[in-house]
Structure formats: C-alpha cells, structure tokens
Swiss-Prot record:
Similarity section: Belongs to the IWR1/SLC7A6OS family.
Entry keyword annotation includes Transport: yes
PANTHER family attached to this UniProt entry: RNA POLYMERASE II NUCLEAR LOCALIZATION PROTEIN SLC7A6OS-RELATED
Function: Directs RNA polymerase II nuclear import.
Biological-process GO terms, alphabetical: developmental process; hematopoietic progenitor cell differentiation; protein transport
Subcellular location: Cytoplasm; Nucleus
InterPro entries documented for this protein: SLC7A6OS (IPR040218), TF_Iwr1_dom (IPR013883)
GO terms for cellular component: cytoplasm; nucleus
Record keywords, A-Z: Cytoplasm, Nucleus, Phosphoprotein, Protein transport, Transport
Name of protein: Probable RNA polymerase II nuclear localization protein SLC7A6OS
Composition-biased stretches (Acidic residues): 233-245, 254-264
Main subcellular location: cytoplasm
Amino acid sequence: MEAGRTAVLRVKRKLGTEPAEALVLACKRLRSSAVELETPKTSPEGLERAAENNVFQLVATVRSQEEPVQPLLRAALRPSQGSQQRIRHHLRASAREIRQEGRYRVVFSRRSSGIPSDSLESEDASGTAKAADDANFQLLDLVHEEDAEVAAAAISCKKSDPDVILCNCVELIREGLNVSQCGPSSGHQKEQKDDFVYDIYCLERATPGWIENILSVQPYSHEWELVNDDQQPEDIYDDEDDENSENNWRNEYPEEENSDEDEDSRGSDNYSSSEERDNSRQPMWSKYPLDVQKEFDYDSPHDLDSD
C-alpha cells in the first residue's frame, strides 16, 4: 500500500498551557508538478479549488526543537487508518472543553529538507516495513500566541516559589533586589528556553498536493463537525416551523368572509323583526276605528270623519 502524502505541524507552545488535541487547518491545495504531468490538462476554471479543512491529530510533545520527529511519526503512521478513527472517536466522545485560546502563526515551512528518505516508515498487515518517499513529507513550524488576558491568568496561576515572602499577597522587594544583583547568566537563559515545548501534529494526506495558502488554524473541539458549508437554507429544518401547530402563521386564515356572513345574518334578523312589528301594527290600526265608535256611540264610521 502506497503511503500518502504526510504533513506535520510543529507548534511552539508556552509551558503550562493546555495543548489542543487537534488542529483544523483551512487552506487551498497546490498541486505538485509531478502530479500535473500525470494528470490531463484542465481548464483554468477546473484548476481553481475551494478552501478545504484538514484535521491534524496531536502525536506527541517534545522539549526541544532539535529532537527528531521521525520516530514519533513512525509510531503514529503505523496503524494509520485505525489511529485516525480512534482519535476522532475520542475527540467527539470527550466532554472536556478545550481551554486553548489565542491564535497560531506559521513561521516556517519545509518540504522534506534534511530528512532521510528511510526515516518515515509504515507497516502493512504482514508486518514488513516500507520506506516512505522523501518527496511526500512537509513540515510546518507554528507559534502559538496567547491573548494578553490568557497570559496574565496563566502567570497568576503559576506555582509560587516557596522562598518568596509575601505580604497581603504582594511580593516583597527582597526578591526584586536579588534578581537585580544577579546578572544575565546562561542558567537564566536556559530557564527561559525551557519555558516552551513543541507539539507535533500529523496528517496523512491521501490526496496529492502540498499545503499552500493557509487561511486559518483553529483548535479542534468535540462539537466541530466538518459539514458542507454550501448547504442551502431551505434544507435546514426549523423546529419552531411546525405546520400542525395552532400558533403557526400558516394556520391563520382571514376572517373577512365570516364577518360578511355575520353582517348578512344580522341584517336579515333586523328585517324580519321589523316585518313582524308592522304586521302586528296593522290589525291594531284597523281595530282602532271600531273601538272609538263604540266608545262615543257613533252609528257609522262616517260620523268619525265629519267630526
């Protein structure tokens, strides 16, 4: 089985801060010249590629930049596919939040310079070792830069020296005098140098091409899901948009027809009531002359007209 292209990140981190278990590097891939010769020529539109996300897994942490990374990569690449699946499962199942803050800055990039071709090895199912191709190795050096607030918090949480005398949580001047009397020495410089460690992150690329045009480097969290960013908004289901709900705006119908029917019904009721009153008045009005005739002892209705 041919070994894929391997990319390595070496991050310079201040001692005492938590390392990120994985880094997500967004970049645009640049195809190598050898691959361009093998592949057929394509149009300029086909050569343009969108940004892609690459997940680098934490392999190990070393104390010095001079320490070789080949043995660490050899152990990490031996069960290549199984390791990535196991690490991904561990990252997603972990409930611990990454406390890493700040940003990562790329300071150096190298493609297989000064690394022997037989330094990187990967074993197949039978256990035989194969030398990795020297042209398929890329190393990038990064520096983790902390924010000012995070750096101040890290300094405040640093373990105190038992020889330091404090008064109301304030260090006495004696410690400052001792530091001023001691000139710069190699021991002090070595102590400052030992304040940093180097985290090694590895990615075995199955697709050809070098990592170029780095856009961003971010810590990988267990909530990070590499989904398609081109997902259409209409494909996303909204929990609140329930068509069967009574409060949904789709279920609100206009009440104009009902109001017209109510007005018609009220008008017909008024008309019928007025007709009933008129009908009741007619017999009463027709009966009125007879009542008057009887009361005043008139013989005929003409006598009422003469009066």
